[in-house]
UniProtKB/Swiss-Prot annotation:
This is Large ribosomal subunit protein bL12. Keywords: Ribonucleoprotein, Ribosomal protein. It holds the Pfam family Ribosomal_L12_N. It comes from Nocardioides sp. (strain ATCC BAA-499 / JS614). InterPro entries: Ribosomal_bL12 (IPR000206), Ribosomal_bL12_C (IPR013823), Ribosomal_bL12_C/ClpS-like (IPR014719), Ribosomal_bL12_oligo (IPR008932), Ribosomal_bL12_oligo_N_sf (IPR036235). GO terms for molecular function: mRNA binding; structural constituent of ribosome. Belongs to the bacterial ribosomal protein bL12 family. The gene is rplL.
Length: 131
């Protein structure tokens, strides 16, 4: 197999959707046994206290959320537009995602970003949950 330059790889990534990139990262992590998590986040995790380290993290505040589209409601076109704005998906991909609800729109995002996305989607007429 020919060796690809960094620029060629970046050009290939630019052509991919966010969902495709997310799947690529998961596959990369599994193949090489690594994680794409920032080292700062890993170092900050023990500071949460002994409860989280012992597996009892029910009381600990969650710092990463998944934005789940439960249903598009009556205003599906508005929801598709909002999904496109949040994810940079194409029209076809966003429409398929909305029609396949319940589906995650954003995964492992910060609390404030998840809440903003939820508000935007609900404003467009969708039913959304954060997990």
């Amino acid at each position: 197999m020919a060796k690809l330059s960094t620029d060629e790889l970046l050009d290939a990534f630019k052509e991919m959707t966010l969902i495709e990139l997310s799947e690529f990262v998961k596959q990369f992590e599994e193949t090489f046994g690594v994680t794409a998590a920032a080292p700062v986040a890993v170092a900050a995790a023990p500071a949460a206290g002994g409860a989280a380290a012992a597996g009892g993290d029910a009381g600990a505040e969650q710092d990463e959320f998944d934005v789940i589209l439960e249903s598009a409601g009556d205003k599906k076109i508005n929801v598709i537009k909002e999904v496109r704005a949040l994810t940079s998906l194409g029209l076809k991909e966003a429409k398929e995602l909305v029609e396949a609800a319940p589906k995650p729109i954003l995964e492992k995002v910060a609390k404030d970003a998840a809440e903003k996305a939820k508000e935007a989607l609900e404003g467009a007429g969708a039913t959304v949950t954060l997990k």
